[in-house]
């Protein structure tokens, strides 16, 4: 509380218990504050465990209250968080993902790779995420591979980059008879991840809790065809036919999407995703963020007179 009393203004990232306490203190001490909404607490808690399901409604309504009454809000999504947690104040969408450089040689290499793909050759699917956090959703892709195998389609390999205990996902792979099609690559330095992205064929973001996924945008910037779950900002990045639901139908939907990826489709999606990723150019995002921050700074100077 003393820290807030001594400051001129507050910038708080929600959801976060500490940030929530800070905003509460700022309101009490009549200090101007800006909120940056980076994720959905409902999704994070509801998809975690039983205790999370109990806490989810409380956290949801708490964040809804604070954002509704925030005079300045930055959202990391274009639509999702804005719809779920609207504000009466001023707002701007500024992704917390910012790509530094684009090189058209990347998309040229991707298109060449797709063109040279042989009929029935191995198709490598990839995901970067912790492998011991169940809401990351890799198990749904593994189950889909099992279903495709029963249909006679065995040319898919799923590579997982990320740290953590692999026991659960390995058990799912074994149960679905696809242990030989699932490869755990472990943690990888960021620069090596880009090299790996250039090797795989399709990227999938199957998680049930997200803000705006950096990993997916980075994959798109390498010209990768991609698909993902109907979670948070993922549908803002991909075309609707490459989104699967978070329901009991999701395994069938993943299978349908994977079967749809022929050469023509992969070429179209490679081009489309590469262009879409350019919206996350660091210079564009930083310009928008700085303009909004300057406006908040001016507002903060005169807050005592207008607050």
Please name every model-derived segment.
Residues 206-208:
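Aromatic "clamp/platform" in nucleotide-sugar-dependent glycosyltransferases that forms part
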Residues 216, 225-228:
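Short hydrophobic beta-strand element within catalytic cores of glycosyltransferases
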């Amino acid at each position: 509380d003393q820290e807030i009393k001594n400051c001129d203004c507050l910038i708080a990232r929600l959801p976060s218990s500490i940030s929530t306490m800070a905003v509460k203190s700022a309101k009490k001490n009549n200090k101007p504050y800006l909120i940056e909404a980076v994720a959905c607490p409902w999704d994070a808690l509801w998809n975690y465990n039983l205790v999370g399901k109990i806490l989810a409604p409380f956290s949801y309504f708490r964040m809804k209250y604070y954002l509704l009454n925030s005079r300045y809000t930055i959202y990391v999504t274009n639509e999702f968080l804005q719809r779920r947690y609207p504000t009466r104040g001023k707002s701007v969408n500024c992704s917390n993902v910012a790509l530094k450089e684009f090189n058209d040689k990347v998309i040229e290499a991707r298109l060449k790779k797709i063109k040279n793909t042989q009929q029935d050759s191995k198709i490598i699917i990839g995901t970067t995420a912790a492998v011991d956090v169940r809401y990351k959703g890799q198990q749904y892709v593994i189950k889909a591979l099992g279903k495709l195998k029963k249909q006679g389609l065995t040319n898919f390999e799923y590579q997982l980059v990320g740290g953590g205990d692999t026991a659960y996902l390995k058990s799912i792979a074994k149960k679905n008879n696809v242990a030989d099609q699932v490869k755990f690559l472990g943690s990888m330095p960021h620069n090596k991840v880009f090299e790996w992205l250039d090797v795989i064929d399709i990227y999938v973001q199957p998680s049930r809790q997200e803000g705006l996924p950096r990993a997916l945008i980075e994959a798109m910037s390498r010209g990768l065809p991609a698909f993902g779950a109907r979670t948070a900002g993922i549908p803002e990045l991909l075309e609707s036919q490459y989104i699967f639901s978070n329901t009991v139908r999701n395994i069938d939907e993943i299978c349908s999407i994977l079967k749809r990826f022929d050469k023509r489709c992969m070429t179209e999606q490679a081009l489309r995703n590469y262009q879409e990723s350019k919206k996350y150019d660091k210079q564009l995002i930083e310009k928008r963020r700085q303009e909004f921050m300057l406006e908040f700074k001016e507002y903060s100077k005169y807050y005592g007179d207008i607050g």
